[in-house]
A protein has these predicted regions:
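A short beta-strand-loop structural module common to alpha/beta enzyme folds
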Residues: 25-35
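Cysteine-nucleophile active-site neighborhood
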Residues: 53-126, 131
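Acyltransferase
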Residues: 195-223
Length: 223
């Protein structure tokens, strides 16, 4: 597996790079890298073509609004059009929302805490999420269970565009994970690389495997 990692200048981005490198070969590019260079890097090698594989794109966390993050929005548009397996994390997730026609806005600053967030029906059907799902504690109500995750963000969304489906959300409706309905693209508002996401390494390993398994997935969608 080969990963093209777009660095959005987050302070802890190499924690995520190191975690990813346990599962795949990783090439890191700053978000100021020309789109043509990124497109070339995302082209399958001869060996990958023979094996029916192609690189996976990771859009890293970072500061600011996704539309101000170098060429991230442009390469994400390419990835969605060409159905390149893509994982967006924090700022990368927000880029997914904006690229699909949604709006990212202030939702209140949450920096450095673990939250238990509720899985949706679509979320519990994702193998990577069901593998780390926690049963409700006494007094909690969650039909499909919870996951414990690390939050470091002030922007987010409570409403997704039609092409995205929620996998997890906070008690007050902030979307914490989503997938594209027809492209192999998943986004996490939270940080799997943080020690405050206890099952983060397991989740990341599963997502990398799931996204590269079927490059042109098209699954049924839940409302």
């Amino acid at each position: 597996m080969r990963v093209i990692f777009l660095d959005n200048r987050d302070s802890f981005v190499y924690n995520l790079v190191d975690l990813t490198a346990r599962e795949a070969g990783v090439q890191v590019f700053r978000n100021t890298t020309p789109v043509a260079t990124l497109r070339d890097a995302l082209e399958p090698t001869a060996e990958e073509r023979t094996a029916g594989e192609r690189p996976l794109l990771i859009l890293s966390p970072g500061p600011g609004h996704p539309r101000q993050a170098g060429h991230m929005m442009e390469i994400l548009d390419v990835a969605l059009q060409e159905k390149i397996p893509t994982l967006g994390i924090c700022l990368g997730f927000q880029a997914m929302v904006e690229a699909c026609g949604g709006v990212v806005a202030p939702v209140g600053a949450t920096h450095g805490r673990t939250d238990r967030v509720e899985l949706t029906e679509a979320g519990i059907e994702e193998p990577s999420f069901s593998a780390i799902a926690e049963t409700p504690r006494p007094g909690e109500e969650a039909t499909h269970g919870y996951i414990s995750i690390a939050r470091y963000h002030s922007l987010g969304t409570r409403s997704l565009p039609e092409s995205l489906i929620s996998l997890a959300h906070t008690h007050d409706g902030i979307v914490m994970a989503a997938r594209h309905r027809s492209a192999p693209c998943i986004g996490l508002q939270f940080h799997p690389e943080s020690i405050l996401t206890p099952a983060g390494p397991l989740l990341l390993r599963g997502l990398l495997a799931d996204l590269t398994l079927s490059p042109s997935i098209s699954r049924s969608s839940h409302e």
